[in-house]
Amino acid sequence: MTAEDSTRFKRAQWRFILCSMIAYAFFYITRKNLSMAQPEMLERGVITKEALGTILTVHGVLYGVSRFVNGFWADKLNGRIFMTIGLALSALMNFLFGCTSLTVLFAAFWIVNGWTQGMGFPPCAKMLTHWIHPKELATKMSIWNTSHSFGSAMALGLCSMLFALGMGWRWCFYVPAALAGLAAVFCFFCVKDGPHEDGLPELDLSDVRGKADGAERTVTDADRRRLVYRNHVIWLCALANFFVYVVRFGFLDWGPTFLKEYKGIDVSKGGLMIIAFELAAVVGTIFAGWITDKLFAGRGVRTCVFCMLFAGLCALGFWYLPNGAPIWQATLLLMGTGFFIYGPQALIGIVAAQQATNDAAAMANGFMGIMGYAATTVSGVGIALISKYLGWNAALLSIGGFALIGMVFFLFAWNAQATGYKKASA
């Protein structure tokens, strides 16, 4: 690559990172809006807590299955087009959800939304590994991963604003649907599948593959399956991911509800507290990626061990916090949980991509997705039942314990190498 090509590549790389971050954030806006709408839906008797918990669980499981299946296809197809279709369909499902009052249709539209949401991350994982060199991936992909937090914060902030303006829960679906439709158009025209779509040469990976990175390499489906399913590090991280997502969605899906029921904080203030959780997550995500590259030489699993430990302690601290404690104390503990839990959330995708190489990055992240979103069996209906029959104290204690279990799985993978490129080329 010439000096001129290198300069053009860096500009195009950051343009891709920014554009794909914006597009992916709108997947979250059309997913996390439900957590803000649900307190009013429950209060008005539009839906029961058990039905809502079941919908959240099935939605999450199907989302995980979708990421798994679409991970296979995203490695083969154009990521830009794949992502655009998923975002457009998510916008449609949100609009339809806002139009109905029947529980069966709530379930149908949100479950289909779970599938279309799974068309977002796998193509991004593939495209990122084609745009970013493995030696920079932890830092730059961690920056990209803040799109999760920005998207969630935008959903919470937007819905809080709509409630403050006196608009009902339906507008929490109409407005995000309209914005996501515009974002789908933006994605189609601005996100690039790889350097080739910008007229640039592909990344040279000969230094990490351990031999010439020939352009004529042929990768079969059997090769991709071997890279993913015969890698013990990917399996350990997938198991750990289950517990990462229990903690993450325990707070995201139920945060506004338990703050209202458990602490007596109204939905608007509770939404702002969860926004603080997400903003702390942005800082934590970037910090985790930076520490991984600078302190642990790209070994993201080691960063995850410490993050899960402190995330668990923060969650347990929230459980220990007495009723009537100042709201700023609860906010700080929420922010601490967000800061630490989003490190593993981002790094697991990076570790999967590094271990499976850019030949199977989408498939590996699809596998991570199905394991992570299987956690909604706990964070959805599980938390609903625990909070109903045992109270929010028991629910928060459980979330803290799950974080520490996840830490143990990461410990088993402590000695993992930073990437799987040399092993794949052997």
Question: In which residue ranges do the predicted regions lie?
Answer:
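Conserved MFS/SLC helix-loop-helix module at the cytosolic interface between two early adjacent transmembrane helices
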Residues: V65-V104
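C-terminal ends and interior cores of transmembrane alpha-helices
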Residues: A88-S101, L309-N323
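Cytoplasmic helix-loop-helix junction between adjacent transmembrane helices
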Residues: F109-F150
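Helix-loop-helix hairpin linking two adjacent transmembrane segments in secondary transporters
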Residues: W144-P195
